[in-house]
Regions:
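Gly-rich Lys/Arg/Thr-decorated short loops/hinges at beta-loop-alpha junctions or inter-strand turns
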Residues: 95-99, 205-214, 249-251, 283-291, ...
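Cofactor-binding active-site loop characterized by glycine-rich and histidine/acidic residues
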Residues: 100-112, 116-126, 133-275, 298-299
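Cofactor-/ligand-binding subdomain signature composed of acidic, glycine-rich
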Residues: 40-43, 47, 63, 78-126
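Short internal beta-strands
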Residues: 164-167, 280-287
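Long, well-ordered, tryptophan-enriched scaffold segments
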Residues: 286-418
């Protein structure tokens, strides 16, 4: 092994674990069984540790980038991979604090979720077969709740307001929130998908059907992401030419992971990066499920989307694990739990959540005796309660705050939910 490659490999091993800069450079690098000089490896790990502790992760990142550049200039072929480890982008100690009342917001969220379900069920009782989506909003409720409570800003005399593209299938939840706020009557909620008599609610967001309620149409699926990109670009156009002050306005686009397979959903993402649309924020509800089955049963949709968007020049924020996982991550000094998370595909994660704590203990933690020992003091219920990041308002708030503050790139939040 030549000196340049040896230096690069040993630095990257530590950076992958602690900085989360890269996920895999190649199987060769990640296969520790090929390490023919463990002492040298340990020396480089300790050296990088020292840089991180003394000068911070930014300096360490710079050194790694210089090493990669030097290796490539020397003729080394280093495959590029745009994915990072299957963990939250923002570590716990860097989370921006949630400023609200978690208990009060949880109660409000529960009422909205209940009313969203009842709107669909009561409509189908009155008119069997009329349809309506229940699961989409239930999985995304926290994502919307944190946005409404802390980030979405309405228009006023001095500010044009933020623009929000709501995922079409989540409309029952948006109606339910409006009802709770007193902006919609019970009669209207009871007439979900029944517009012909003049006092009903449209199936999906559409300003022609409900001009005083919806800003943008987002169905058929995939149109919201595409239009959101061009809306954000238009706001930049207005500001750059002095037509209107849109400098602080944000465009939020909510969509599902299955929806991202629509050709329109990712059709203009390179334009958003090229135009540096830092006024644009995508929020993808990654519940791993579409109408007809898993989105990527034998893969990882979050990793795939991260690769697509990061490779196109976006700022990617992954919100995968909730706060109940934090103590386990703190114990994971050897990276074994992260390794297990990398091994599992989305179909397995769905299985773990569906079959409960005992099954998860045996099949997820049980693969490695060391992992199983770490959860020995936890009940099956405790293991079942280990939450996904998209249901944790603290994790979601931190990601949104980072996205709003980010400059020079559009941002995408990939939130894992049930």
């Amino acid at each position: 092994m030549n000196t340049v490659n040896s230096i690069l490999i040993n630095i990257l091993l530590r950076s992958i674990f602690k900085l989360r800069i890269f996920h895999r450079i190649s199987k060769l690098i990640m296969d520790l069984s090929l390490d023919n000089d463990e002492l040298e490896t340990q020396e480089w790990i300790e050296a990088l540790n020292s840089v991180i502790d003394a000068e911070g992760s930014e300096r360490a990142h710079f050194l790694i980038e210089m090493m990669i550049d030097q290796a490539r200039r020397s003729g080394s072929n280093l495959p590029y991979n745009a994915t990072t480890a299957y963990v939250n982008t923002i570590p716990t100690h860097l989370q921006q604090r949630h400023p609200g009342s978690p208990d009060m917001e949880r109660r409000i969220r529960a009422l909205i979720r209940w009313n969203a379900i009842m709107a669909v069920l009561r409509a189908n009782t009155k008119s069997p077969g009329i349809g309506g989506h229940i699961a989409s909003f239930q999985s995304a409720a926290t994502l919307y709740d944190v946005g409404f409570n802390h980030f979405f800003r309405a228009e006023n005399d001095s500010f044009g307001g933020d623009l929000v593209y709501f995922q079409g299938h989540s409309s029952p939840g948006i109606y339910a929130r409006a009802y709770l706020e007193g902006r919609m009557t019970e009669e209207q909620l009871d007439n979900f998908r029944m517009e012909t008599k003049g006092n009903g609610l449209s199936s999906y967001p559409h300003p022609w059907l409900m001009p005083d309620f919806w800003q943008f149409p987002t169905v058929s699926m995939g149109l919201g992401p595409l239009m959101g990109i061009y809306q954000a670009r238009y706001l930049k156009y207005l500001h750059d030419r002095g037509i209107a002050d849109t400098s602080d306005r944000k465009v939020w686009v909510f969509c599902g992971d299955g929806e991202m397979d629509e050709p329109e959903s990712q059709g203009a993402i390179s334009l958003a990066a090229r135009e540096k649309l830092d006024n644009l924020i995508f929020v993808v509800n990654c519940n791993l499920q579409r109408l007809d089955g898993p989105v990527r049963g034998n893969g990882k949709i979050i990793q795939e989307l991260e690769s697509n968007f990061r490779g196109s020049g976006w700022n990617v924020l992954k919100v995968i694990w909730g706060s109940y996982w934090d103590p386990l991550f703190a114990m994971d000094k050897d990276g074994l739990m992260k390794k297990r998370m990398e091994e599992c595909v989305d179909g397995e994660f769905q299985n773990f959540k569906a079959k409960g704590g005992a099954f998860t203990r045996a099949e997820f933690f049980g693969k490695y005796p060391e992992l199983k020992e770490r959860v020995a003091a936890m009940s099956d219920h405790d293991i079942w309660r280990l939450n996904r990041g998209g249901h944790d308002p603290h994790k979601v708030y931190a990601a949104y705050a980072a996205a709003v503050a980010h400059k020079g790139q559009p941002s995408i939040v990939l939130a894992k939910t049930v």
